[in-house]
Regions:
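Receiver (REC) domain active-site loop signature in two-component systems and cognate sites
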Residues: 56
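C-terminal output helix
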Residues: 106-117
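CheY-like receiver
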Residues: 123-134
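Acidic, metal-coordinating helix/loop segments flanking the phosphotransfer/catalytic sites
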Residues: 31-49
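Charged docking surfaces used in two-component/phosphorelay signaling
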Residues: 16-24
Length: 134
């Protein structure tokens, strides 16, 4: 079974680069360019994991993560921030709004893929993933 990942970033080059590499690893990848769009896509595709940029227009990563945690359907979805904001306080703020992990840009693909694999392995061990709505 293919895991569903929602990748959210307002930089199209990053979306395409990360999506390409995750698809090569066998994941089904959905994308959104801001938080508001991400919430709509997440409600439709029910991702196992959300990779979320912090700085975006319309709705930033912190607002998006808070909304995910308040949503009864999405609240248990794993969220990993991928952000250029790398200071300790900024990372702690990400955890404060509900992130499960925080990686800084520039993205190191091998590290990201390893982190994704580890998270999804834990998800599979904890509970069977839900099916996407028909």
């Amino acid at each position: 079974m293919s895991h569903r990942i929602l990748l959210v970033d307002d930089e199209v080059d990053i979306l395409e680069f990360v999506r390409y590499n995750l698809v090569r690893e066998g994941y089904e990848v959905f994308t959104a360019e801001n938080g508001a769009e991400a919430l709509k896509v997440a409600a439709e595709c029910r991702p196992h994991l959300i990779l979320l940029d912090m700085m975006m227009p319309v709705m930033d990563g912190a607002q998006t993560c808070r909304a995910i945690r308040r949503n009864p359907v999405l609240k248990d979805t794993m969220v990993v921030f991928l952000s250029a904001l790398g200071e300790e306080g900024q990372q702690l703020a990400g955890f404060d709004v509900g992130a499960d992990d925080y990686l800084t840009k520039p993205i190191k693909m091998k590290l990201l893929v390893s982190r994704v694999q580890a998270i999804l392995k834990r998800i599979d061990a904890d509970r069977p993933p839900e099916k996407a709505p028909a």
